[in-house]
């Protein structure tokens, strides 16, 4: 009887060892996949950053050379009444919840905005965000069905078109985006950034640049 029991225990131990080995293989495979996706995301970010910085520089040049910009896409000059009204917020989350605080921090920023401005219209990218707001009976103005993990220019244009149409109609006075900023491979943080209207303070730097004398024409005005 003792021998039978010992054999059973030995077999159970071997089974557990094999199970641990299989789990380790799966974990290593998941790690390799995650590392590959992280490198791709980093490369995509590095490729798009020059375009972002160039656009930021052009907007800064406009503010530096045009003191009184009369456009609905620019914040009113100092001394004029501030913009009041409904906000629009583009909330970008992942499709899955296995991402640590990645999604929770974005949701926390979105809930903070809703606490401050309850009439904010939500535009949501990512299954995690859609599920959270639906589960908590928080209305969404629009939820985009494609994944945030596979962004394309076409999808970005579709989002921009919907937001700009609402902005031009006067459905909301300001557009914000809540997203995760990748500081390095180990650190990321949620940010809330206003997209429209542009504000002079957002583009002020200590860098001295050559003045531009060519007049600007805004289309649409």
Q: What positions do the PLM features span?
A:
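C-terminal beta-strand-loop-alpha-helix "lid" module of Rossmann-like NAD(P)-dependent dehydrogenases
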Residues: 5-221
């Amino acid at each position: 009887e003792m021998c039978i029991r010992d054999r059973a225990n030995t077999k159970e131990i071997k089974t557990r060892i094999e199970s641990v080995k299989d789990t380790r293989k799966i974990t290593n495979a998941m790690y390799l996949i995650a590392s590959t996706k992280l490198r791709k995301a980093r490369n995509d970010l590095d490729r798009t950053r020059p375009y972002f910085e160039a656009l930021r520089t052009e907007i800064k040049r406009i503010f530096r050379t045009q003191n009184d910009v009369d456009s609905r896409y620019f914040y009113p000059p100092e001394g004029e009444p501030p913009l009041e009204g409904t906000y629009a917020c583009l909330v970008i989350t992942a499709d899955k919840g296995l991402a640590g605080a990645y999604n929770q921090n974005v949701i926390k920023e979105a809930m903070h905005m809703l606490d401050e401005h309850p009439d904010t219209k939500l535009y949501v990218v990512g299954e995690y965000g859609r599920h959270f707001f639906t589960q908590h009976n928080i209305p969404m103005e629009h939820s985009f069905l494609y994944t945030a993990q596979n962004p394309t220019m076409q999808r970005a244009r579709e989002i921009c078109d919907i937001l700009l149409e609402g902005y031009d109609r006067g459905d909301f006075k300001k557009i914000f985006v809540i997203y995760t900023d990748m500081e390095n491979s180990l650190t990321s943080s949620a940010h809330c950034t206003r997209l429209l209207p542009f504000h002079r303070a957002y583009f002020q730097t200590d860098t001295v640049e050559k003045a531009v004398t060519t007049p600007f024409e805004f289309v649409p005005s």
